[in-house]
């Protein structure tokens, strides 16, 4: 009767008390994109809706300024 235990997801930005997400913080943004360059949805990461919108906007700005790639390395 062993049941699978799923760990509860939590929003990292809410826990830290972040007011906004900066597009220049590439290390944080890289945690929320896949290897192919797609933005990871909030149902996977557990990010709150408010911060998911800010995260999406920050990733798109960083892509536009060539701080992040639009796609993978095309190997």
From Swiss-Prot:
Could you tell me which InterPro entries the record lists for this protein?
Ribosomal_bS18, Ribosomal_bS18_CS, Ribosomal_bS18_sf
On whether RNA-binding is a keyword of this UniProt record, the answer is: yes
The protein's matches in PROSITE patterns, at most eight in alphabetical order, are given as: RIBOSOMAL_S18
One GO molecular-function entry: structural constituent of ribosome
Q: Which HAMAP family match?
A: Ribosomal_bS18
Q: Which family does it belong to?
A: Belongs to the bacterial ribosomal protein bS18 family.
Q: What is this protein called?
A: Small ribosomal subunit protein bS18
Q: What is the scientific name of the source organism?
A: Colwellia psychrerythraea (strain 34H / ATCC BAA-681)
